[in-house]
């Protein structure tokens, strides 16, 4: 016991010696510290970023100028990906099919596309996963031509007619089929025509080559303002989406191979952070903010039209990137009804999306 006491006293003496030998802070030191604290008081708290497994990311998208992918555009234009340490290269695919092929072949790391594509891949035993949601409604409207369907009264009048969709098998095709079925018209009783999402679709409707159209923004608003179309079903709103699908319908998302997500969790988190940051910005963005941020070419030579289209889809944008609880089930049911090769019992819904990244980003950005 005596030995232990001596050790204690010896340690105490060393502690006192160390304290006495430490230089006392001078007035200059105190002033410097105060200035440093004052200088950093207004700066945001920096979040320590874990090391990214992959910093250079190839992302493929079909129709990036569409409002369907506005969160991606905003995150890119405002430098949110760079801020997260991501060197993002966005490649425009010629079609949804081409975008799908790019990500499934490994030519692209990530795809910005419809959640339905993930369900379709999973039904074929190709394991892909959505890791952040951009849209909580499809933003697609179905309308009839005012030229060839003048005096339109009922969906039954569309039997035997030509219906324009962005692409065969696309969300616009699925929605057109559902709307027709609700009106007693089978999809095989009409002729679907792939017209894309650009000016060519408008020209086809304007010249009488189409009798109806199912498409996305800003194309629909442009056709409405020109008096070329009369909208009869609208998933640009949450209410309209429930009317068509009976529940929430997830739309655009970022998705990748499940193995890629598992091996690159920090990278996926960084990309999710960028998208959720963009989604939060969009919640309060005014017309001037949109005009200053979105590339001029996306406006199709009409800023007013683009802003009108934005307001029509605004509520369809996800507020936080999180997949809604009933969304996957609603989407799978719609896919199974549209495509007989998609079997509900063959798709494990929990494996088609990952909410962990979005939940963390939501907390970080208070989205």
What feature does the model see in each segment?
Residues 332-367:
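Conserved C-terminal helix/tail region of periplasmic/extracytoplasmic solute-binding proteins
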Residues 1-25:
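Secretory targeting signals
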Residues 261-342:
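Secondary-structure end/capping motifs
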Residues 63, 244-245, 323:
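Short Gly/Pro-enriched turn/cap motifs at secondary-structure boundaries
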Residues 22, 29-48:
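N-terminal export signals
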Residues 200-295:
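Pocket-lining segment of extracytoplasmic ligand-binding domains
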Residues 49-197, 204-217, 221, 228, ...:
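Short, glycine-/small- and polar/acidic-enriched structural segments
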Residues 75, 115, 174, 254-255, ...:
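A generic alpha-helix surface/boundary motif
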């Amino acid at each position: 016991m005596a030995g232990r006491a001596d050790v204690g006293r010896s340690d105490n003496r060393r502690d006192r010696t160390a304290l006495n030998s430490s230089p006392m802070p001078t007035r200059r030191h105190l002033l410097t510290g105060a200035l440093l604290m004052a200088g950093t008081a207004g700066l945001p708290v920096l979040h320590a970023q874990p090391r990214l497994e992959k910093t250079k990311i190839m992302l493929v998208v079909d129709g990036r100028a569409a409002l369907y992918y506005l969160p991606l555009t905003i995150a890119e234009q405002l430098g949110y990906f760079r801020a997260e340490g991501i060197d993002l290269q966005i490649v425009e695919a010629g079609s949804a099919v081409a975008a799908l092929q790019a990500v499934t072949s490994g030519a692209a790391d990530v795809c910005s596309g419809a959640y339905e594509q993930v369900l379709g891949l999973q039904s074929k035993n190709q394991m892909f996963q959505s890791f952040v949601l951009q849209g909580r409604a499809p933003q697609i409207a179905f309308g009839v031509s005012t030229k060839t369907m003048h005096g339109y009264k009922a969906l039954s009048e569309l039997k035997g007619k030509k219906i324009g969709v962005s692409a065969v098998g696309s969300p616009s095709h699925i929605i057109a089929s559902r709307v027709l079925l609700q009106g007693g018209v089978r999809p095989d009783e009409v002729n679907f025509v792939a017209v894309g999402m650009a000016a060519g679709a408008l020209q086809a409707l304007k010249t009488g080559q189409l009798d109806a159209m199912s498409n996305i923004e800003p194309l629909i608003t442009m056709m409405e303002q020109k008096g070329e179309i009369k909208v009869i079903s609208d998933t640009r709103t949450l209410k309209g989406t429930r009317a068509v699908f009976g529940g929430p319908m997830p739309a655009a998302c970022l998705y990748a191979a499940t193995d890629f997500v598992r091996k690159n969790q920090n990278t996926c988190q960084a990309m999710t952070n960028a998208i959720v940051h963009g989604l939060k910005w969009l919640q309060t963005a005014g017309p001037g903010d949109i005009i200053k941020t979105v590339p001029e070419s996306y406006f199709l030579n009409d800023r007013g039209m683009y802003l009108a289209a934005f307001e029509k889809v605004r509520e369809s944008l996800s507020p936080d990137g999180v997949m809604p609880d009933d969304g996957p089930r609603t989407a799978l049911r719609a896919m199974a009804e549209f495509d007989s090769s998609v079997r509900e019992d063959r798709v494990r819904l929990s494996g088609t999306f990952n909410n962990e990244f979005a939940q963390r980003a939501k907390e970080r950005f208070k989205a």
